[in-house]
Amino acid sequence: MLDSLKQKKNFQRIKMRIKTGDLVKVINGKDKGKTGEVLKTIPLENRVVVKGINLRTKHVKPTQEGETGRILTEEASLHASNVMFFSKDKNLTSKIEYFIDKEGVKKRRLKKTGEVID
């Protein structure tokens, strides 16, 4: 699917405000209300993979003789619009905005509280 997205003429990369390692809360879907750490971002599809959220079971057949099949559980991706940044210190969710500090460095902060993330 990624190759088909890259081949489009008017393709633009989606700018994501959520990054790998951020703590997010699911705001929509079957796992609504759960929090987890972002393991991977997929900017081309505007999706994120969150630890312990949106688990899928995968049945794996044995590949060699004498080996048994197994059932794996792995995280599937979520659309980035279904998660929101979660602040552990303030215990709230908030949108993220970018700003340039006094030294001229671009940083992120929470819109609700003004807390600087990085």
Swiss-Prot record:
Keyword NADP assigned: no
Gene Ontology MF annotations: rRNA binding; structural constituent of ribosome
Keywords assigned by UniProt, alphabetized: Ribonucleoprotein, Ribosomal protein, RNA-binding, rRNA-binding
Superkingdom assignment: Bacteria
InterPro entries, sorted: KOW, Rib_uL2_dom2, Ribosomal_uL24, Ribosomal_uL24_CS, Ribosomal_uL24_KOW, Translation_prot_SH3-like_sf
SUPFAM superfamilies hit by this protein: Translation proteins SH3-like domain
GO cellular component, one term: ribosome
GO terms (BP aspect): translation
PANTHER family to which the protein is assigned, alphabetical: MITOCHONDRIAL RIBOSOMAL PROTEIN L24
NCBIfam families: rplX_bact (TIGR01079)
Quaternary organization: Part of the 50S ribosomal subunit.
Annotated family: Belongs to the universal ribosomal protein uL24 family.
Function of the protein: One of two assembly initiator proteins, it binds directly to the 5'-end of the 23S rRNA, where it nucleates assembly of the 50S subunit.
Name this protein carries in UniProt: Large ribosomal subunit protein uL24
Biological source species: Prochlorococcus marinus (strain AS9601)
